[in-house]
């Protein structure tokens, strides 16, 4: 297993809808282990396959000490909303307030192709929504209100990583595990 470089804002893979997984094989299991290792090394609470350059519908999470994964997810979201700050390992150092559904039910598969239902609220619900967005080629900054998005784009242009498309970790992530 390996820690893989995390793709940064500007890399086209982050804007491309990921392909469904069709082969539940050893390669998928290695990918999931690499995703978990990379997420924990970053550190973050979630990571989607496109964030390491693999355009497949897979994400991993580590919320409240529970580590897991979901393949080919689909979401059912509550109408009730939650407020919270959100960041992203592909946009290091940036965090903005963003409304998300308070509860989420994600249906998908485990690494062996067996059906899985993942239900959660608060941070887990936020994580599942954020990571599923990655699988659809959507970044959290796309969901910001126009004024916040303008601020985010300015911060991206001024970031030390601006213009790079791959991040190799050199120091702990400034959000201390709060990035998704």
UniProtKB/Swiss-Prot annotation:
Coiled coil region boundaries: none
Listed cofactors: Fe(2+)
SUPFAM superfamilies: Peptide deformylase (SSF56420)
The keyword rRNA-binding belongs to this UniProt entry's keyword annotation: no
GO biological process terms held by the UniProt record: co-translational protein modification; translation
Pfam families according to UniProt: Pep_deformylase
Catalysed transformations (reactions): N-terminal N-formyl-L-methionyl-[peptide] + H2O = N-terminal L-methionyl-[peptide] + formate
Domain of life assignment: Bacteria
The EC number(s) this enzyme carries: 3.5.1.88
Residues the entry annotates as binding Fe cation: 88, 130, 134
Active site annotation, chain numbering: 131
GO molecular function, one term: peptide deformylase activity
Cofactor binding remark: Binds 1 Fe(2+) ion.
UniProt cross-references to InterPro entries, sorted A to Z: Peptide_deformylase, Peptide_deformylase_sf
Keyword terms, alphabetized: Hydrolase, Iron, Metal-binding, Protein biosynthesis
Family, as annotated: Belongs to the polypeptide deformylase family.
The protein's role, per its UniProt record: Removes the formyl group from the N-terminal Met of newly synthesized proteins. Requires at least a dipeptide for an efficient rate of reaction. N-terminal L-methionine is a prerequisite for activity but the enzyme has broad specificity at other positions.
NCBIfam families, alphabetized: pept_deformyl, PRK00150.1-3
Protein name (Swiss-Prot/TrEMBL): Peptide deformylase
Organism for this UniProt entry: Acidothermus cellulolyticus (strain ATCC 43068 / DSM 8971 / 11B)
UniProt gene name: def
């Amino acid at each position: 297993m390996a820690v893989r470089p995390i793709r940064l804002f500007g890399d086209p893979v982050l804007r491309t809808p990921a392909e469904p997984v069709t082969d539940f094989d050893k390669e998928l299991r290695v990918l999931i282990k690499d995703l978990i290792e990379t997420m924990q090394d970053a550190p973050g609470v979630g990571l989607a396959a496109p964030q390491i350059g693999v355009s497949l519908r897979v994400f991993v999470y580590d919320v409240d000490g529970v580590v897991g994964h979901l393949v080919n997810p689909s979401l059912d979201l509550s109408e009730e909303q939650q407020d919270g700050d959100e960041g992203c390992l592909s946009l290091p150092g940036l965090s903005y307030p963003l409304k998300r559904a308070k509860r989420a039910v994600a249906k998908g598969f485990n690494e062996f192709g067996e059906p899985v239902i993942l239900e959660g609220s608060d941070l887990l619900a936020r994580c599942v929504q954020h990571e599923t967005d990655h699988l659809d080629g959507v970044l959290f900054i796309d969901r910001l209100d126009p004024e916040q998005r303008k601020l985010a784009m300015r911060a991206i242009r001024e970031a030390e990583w601006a213009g790079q498309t791959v991040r190799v970790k050199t120091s702990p992530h400034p959000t201390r595990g709060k990035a998704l």
